[in-house]
A protein has these predicted regions:
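Concave beta-strand-loop units of leucine-rich repeat
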Residues: 25-26, 31-48, 59-80, 90-103, ...
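The leucine-rich repeat
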Residues: 16, 49-52, 81-84, 104-107, ...
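Extended repeat-based scaffolds of very large eukaryotic assembly and lipid-transport proteins
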Residues: 1-41, 51-52, 57-60
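Aromatic-residue detector
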Residues: 10-13, 20, 180, 254, ...
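Charged/polar, solvent-exposed surface patches and flexible loops
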Residues: 19-22, 90, 109, 253, ...
Length: 270
């Protein structure tokens, strides 16, 4: 039995969820990659009843035991009420909500407060400073790749985040914005900062980003100037430059000053 074709808004009810949970594999609701099951795929549904959401989180231990499911895919949801966010917060593991175009401060707080796992909300294109300040209460990665710009308030909030942050939608970052984002550079070691949408850096911006205490992802940069390479060589953890197409001898010398294994890709290829 395959997934039905989407013709109208589909609300996931308790009755439908019970059928899915009985054998999600038969109903093609398991998301897998290279034969490894990693998520319960409910992307078909654009809404979920509160009763169904409660049943879902209560069933997680059985799903994990039987199917090793830890990730919940709800990318069809277009709205997130505070009540639903409170329930989904109880899901231990990753949650994908990439269909959301916006999120209220209350819902952001309810979803993220002490939540144990990554949260994907890549569909959001605008985020208030208040919402940003609540999202940082999550205890796993935050994926916000739909954001093209960030307010100073949001940047300041994210500087306090102790976990991984993905902002791959940003295509520009001024040195002042980088200062705001990295200002708490002595905070506990975070997982990483993804800025793969940046294709070039000014020297002042590179100097600021190098102060970030965690792994720094800059895979959108294809050509690294010598002075930028020198600045980034001072980065404090692993530096990801997987988009590099060429590297001058001088730039390579600068990057080789970092400890072995802290630059990706391996510089022997340049």
């Amino acid at each position: 039995m395959g997934k039905p074709e989407i013709k109208e808004k589909l609300v996931l009810s308790v009755k439908e969820l019970k059928v899915i949970l009985k054998n999600p594999d038969d109903n093609e609701f398991l998301s897998s990659e290279e034969f490894v099951i990693f998520g319960l795929d409910l992307n078909l549904f654009s809404d979920i009843s509160l009763d169904a959401a409660e049943l879902l989180v209560k069933s997680q231990s059985k799903l994990e035991q039987k199917f090793e499911i830890k990730k919940l895919l709800l990318n069809g949801l277009v709205n997130l009420s505070d009540e639903l966010a409170i329930i989904l917060n109880q899901w231990v593991g990753d949650i994908q909500l990439n269909g959301l175009k916006s999120i209220s401060t209350d819902a952001a707080l309810s979803l993220s407060k002490n939540h144990n796992g990554a949260i994907w909300i890549n569909g959001i294109v605008d985020l208030s400073g208040d919402a940003a300040s609540t999202l940082i209460q999550n205890t796993g990665w935050l994926y916000l790749d739909g954001l093209l710009t960030l307010s100073n308030e949001a940047l300041s909030s994210f500087s306090k985040f102790k976990h991984g942050l993905s902002l791959n939608g940003l295509t520009q970052l001024t040195d002042d914005e980088a200062k705001l984002l990295i200002k708490n550079k002595n905070s506990p070691y975070p997982l990483g900062l993804e800025l793969n949408g940046l294709t070039a850096l000014t020297l002042p911006t590179a100097i600021e980003l190098a102060k970030y205490p965690g792994n720094l992802h800059l895979d959108g940069i294809s050509n690294l100037k010598d002075d930028i390479a020198e600045a980034l060589s001072k980065s404090r953890q692993i530096l990801f430059l997987n988009g590099l197409e060429k590297l001058s001898k001088k730039a390579k010398e600068h990057l080789l000053k970092k400890p072995q294994g802290t630059v990706s890709p391996d510089l022997k290829w340049f």
